[in-house]
Amino acid sequence: SGSCTLRTCWKKMPHFREVGDRLLERFNGASKVMGGNDGKTLIPVGQNIKPPDKQDLIYSDESPDFCLANRKTGSLGTRGRMCNSTAMDISGCDLLCCERGYREESVVFEENCLCRF
């Protein structure tokens, strides 16, 4: 009597944080392009920029200024938003307040902690 070994292989998705980090890296390195005359070629806008490959993110139009309210784009702007003065990401005051400055305010929250002694 013979025996068979069954082996199953599959691809596993990376952790969500890793996917986000990779996308952010590509977003930060995105290249502005315009279409070539042949309708197939993408030409980088600017000097000393390498042509994009299949892994690069590209764009053809500049993003609107989300710092200011704009009915056309649906942006409410960032004026009056709460920010984190110690954060270095998009929730940080330096980025969110668009270099307009900000006012610091201390807020104290009281809540039941459901502690047991």
Swiss-Prot record:
Residues modified by glycosylation: 84
UniProt keyword list: Developmental protein, Disulfide bond, Extracellular matrix, Glycoprotein, Lipoprotein, Secreted, Wnt signaling pathway
Subcellular location: Secreted, Extracellular space, Extracellular matrix
Origin species: Thunnus thynnus (Atlantic bluefin tuna)
Disulfide bond found in the keyword field: yes
Single Gene Ontology BP annotation: canonical Wnt signaling pathway
Keyword ATP-binding belongs to the record: no
Annotated disulfide bonds: 83-98
Role according to the record: Ligand for members of the frizzled family of seven transmembrane receptors. Probable developmental protein. May be a signaling molecule which affects the development of discrete regions of tissues. Is likely to signal over only few cell diameters.
The protein's name in its UniProt record: Protein Wnt-6
Pfam families associated with the record: wnt
Entry GO terms, CC: extracellular space
PANTHER family cross-referenced by the UniProt entry: PROTEIN WNT-6, WNT RELATED
Similarity comment: family membership: Belongs to the Wnt family.
PTM field: Palmitoleoylation is required for efficient binding to frizzled receptors. Depalmitoleoylation leads to Wnt signaling pathway inhibition.
O-palmitoleoyl serine-type lipidated residues: 1
Highest taxon above the source species: Eukaryota
GO MF assignments: cytokine activity; frizzled binding
